[in-house]
Every structure is written in structure tokens, then in C-alpha cells.
Amino acid sequence: MSICTSYDIELWKIIQQETIRQEEHIELIASENYVSTQVMKAQGSQLTNKYAEGYPGKRYYGGCEYVDMIEQLGINRAKELFSADYANIQPHSGSQANFSVYNALLHPGDTILSMHLNHGGHLTHGSQVNFSGKLYNAVFYGVDENGCINYEKVHHLAVKHRPKMIVGGFSAYSGIINWSNLRQIADAVQAYLFIDMAHITGLVAAGIYPNPLPHAHVVTATTHKTLAGPRGGLILASGGNDALYKKLDASVFPGSQGGPLMHVIAAKAIALKEAMDPSFKVYQQKIVQNAKIMVKEFALREFKIISGMTHNHLFLLDLRDKNITGKDASTALERANIIVNKNSIPNDFRSPFITSGIRIGTPAITRRNFNENDVRKLSHWICDILNHIDNNEIIFSIKNKVLRICSQYPIYNKSY
């Protein structure tokens, strides 16, 4: 970075501003986290120079001896960590991984059955604005009045629509999905079961959340979010189906990507190694504990939580009773240096740009070593702002508290 400082002052200043923003803000976006300095070093290494189309031992370019070793190391670690016998670590993102799975197993026009975006699903699970909703016929299941998946309804929809694939996984669901139930439903209609565990990758790696690998035909993951690695995707499978694995590999390259990002693959390999350390399990346990603490404190302050609980790293606040939109809530909180994202809630009548809820996640604050007392205080600061959304004095007072607590927990323990 020192070279960048002198060569491109304009860019460096902006990077420094973002560094300061991260240090001085409390991050509660469930999909964001902080990577280690080891991950950053790998991602900024000379590996960015190397083209390596293909797979280890089967490249279309020469000079791949060492990048082959790096990619194979990452593959082996992914297999070990998730008890898989197949791993593709080339996808540039979770969405790229999902596209590759669909492309490998489906034809345009095939039916998929997945969780509705407004009920906690993801854009790539069949949303009409996404490739998955444009290429495939998406039918959706959702959550019941208690905020939980009703598997009998999922089974009914599967029997009625006979999907080629059932998609499990979420971006905003605080429960534990019963993978076995979904597999039984998929088998009943001879469908593939595809699980997108992007949000819970770290929790699964640590054994905190049930591993979908024994139940799914194929699983995708991201290496950021709860895994706390670089931004990127994984495809995993078990069961020894070599024909399936060949389809998946071909769908990634050459089906949807060219040369893999070897500097990112090296960073993924480091993150996977970090996830094997016993301290990582402690970290993941604390993520869930902190989320549960926040839910309890919000409930004490009479805020409505979708499903009333959480068993993972996130939860949704339903703000309709407070007559606040998600957009207004996130804007007010950001003025106090608290970052959340507005989020649709089940049966939300507001647009995705406004929403009736916010999503809160604890991976980043836990990574930053916030303790239980800090998490309780933070919960009440959020409640105070949401109860006085136009009170500048309260917001400014809480911002000062946020700045003080952030200074106690620097992200990278260095000056800027």
C-alpha cells in the first residue's frame, strides 16, 4: 500500500477514508465480515499475474506448477473441512457458483422450487430480476405465521409442480433448516436437492449448524460472510457421483468462467486453514450467542422479531408496529455509525427499496471481540434510535458512544 500512497494519492485517500469508516462504524450487515491480514496478503500477491484456465494437472496454459499446488491445497482443505469428496474452489462468487449448479443440472424452462426472496431466500433462487428467474420456472415456498418453514406445504408444492430441483438455503432466515426433510421431499418427486449455504458456511464448518452435505446432491457456499475469508464461492458435494462432479466442473470452466483468480484461490485456502483452528469454533459459537442476546434485548424493548428467535448469525426486525420503514431505520442508524441493511419481511407490502424491516447479523462485531455486555448496550442503542428516529440529540449521543467502543476494538490493530 505504501507504493499506492505515493503513486496515486487520489485513490489512496479514498481507500483511507473507507478504512477509517470501517474502524469507526459498527458493522451489523449479516453478509459482511473482516478478513485476516494473511488473507489480504495472499489476495494482493503476485498470483494475480497468473492465468490458469482449466484445473490442476489439466491447464490450457504453461507455467502452472505452483498454482496447481495452491489450488489443490485449497480443494483438499475444503473437502476436509466440510466432509466432502468433491470441491470446486474456482467460482468468483456465490452467485457464480449457483449459476454453475443450475447450468450443470437443468435446462432452460425447468421448474425449481425455492424459498421466496421476501421470505428469506436469495435473488439467485428464482427472482424474476435474476438469471435464475429468467431462465427457469420458479415456484416458491415461504414461512408460516410463526416465521418457520412448513415442510408439509413444501411437499404439497413439490407434488403439485414436480420441480426438477428443490433449492434450500437463505439470506434472511433465522431458523435451522431440516435438510433431511427437504431431501425426502426431493426424493419423492425425483428432484435434485441443491443447498445454498452461503450465509452459514462458517457455522457449518464449525459444526454449529447442521451440515447439508449428507443430504444434498450439491451444495454451494461463499468464503466471506461467516467464514471470514475473501469474497468468493465454492461448490461441494459428497456421495461419489463422478458423473455429477464432471458436470459441475465443466459448468464452472469452460461453462461460465474463464481463468480462475489464483490470488483469490490462495486467499480462500488460507481462510479454510483458519477455519480448521479450534479458535474458529469458539468464534462461531460466540456469533450465535451474540445474535441470541440481541434478540432477547430487542424483545425486552418490545420490538418484533420475525420467528421470535434466532439459531444462527442473523435475525429480522419487523418495524411495522413502530410505523418505521426499513429504509428510514437504516438511515437513522447510519447517522450514529451503526450499519444494518433494510430488508423485506414475509408478506411485505413495501418495495425492496423501502421495506418494512431490517436485517441484523453478528459475524463482524463478534470478529471484533465485542463481549456480551457490549452487545447488550448496542442492542439498546439501536432501540433508542428506532424509538426516537428524528431525535438528533439522541442519535448524536449514541454516535459518540459508538466511536468510543470502536476505538476499544480496532479491527486491524494499527494506526491510520
Curated annotation (Swiss-Prot):
Cofactor needs: pyridoxal 5'-phosphate
Cross-referenced Gene3D superfamilies: Aspartate Aminotransferase, domain 1, Type I PLP-dependent aspartate aminotransferase-like (Major domain)
Residue(s) carrying N6-(pyridoxal phosphate)lysine: K225
Chief subcellular location: cytoplasm
Record's signal peptide: none
Entry annotated with the keyword Cytoplasm: yes
Subcellular location: Cytoplasm
KW Calcium (keyword) present: no
One of the Pfam families matching this protein, by short name: SHMT
SUPFAM superfamilies in alphabetical order: PLP-dependent transferases
Residue numbers binding (6S)-5,6,7,8-tetrahydrofolate: L117, G121, H122, L123, S351, P352, F353
EC assignment: 2.1.2.1
Keyword terms: Amino-acid biosynthesis, Cytoplasm, One-carbon metabolism, Pyridoxal phosphate, Transferase
One GO MF term: pyridoxal phosphate binding
Domain of life where this protein originates: Bacteria
Family annotation (PROSITE patterns): SHMT (PS00096)
GO cellular component: cytosol
An example Gene Ontology biological process: tetrahydrofolate interconversion
Residues carrying the site annotation Plays an important role in substrate specificity: H224
Catalysed reactions listed for this entry: (6R)-5,10-methylene-5,6,7,8-tetrahydrofolate + glycine + H2O = (6S)-5,6,7,8-tetrahydrofolate + L-serine
Protein family per UniProt: Belongs to the SHMT family.
Function: Catalyzes the reversible interconversion of serine and glycine with tetrahydrofolate (THF) serving as the one-carbon carrier. This reaction serves as the major source of one-carbon groups required for the biosynthesis of purines, thymidylate, methionine, and other important biomolecules. Also exhibits THF-independent aldolase activity toward beta-hydroxyamino acids, producing glycine and aldehydes, via a retro-aldol mechanism.
Subunit structure: Homodimer.
Designated name of the protein: Serine hydroxymethyltransferase
Native source species: Blochmanniella pennsylvanica (strain BPEN)
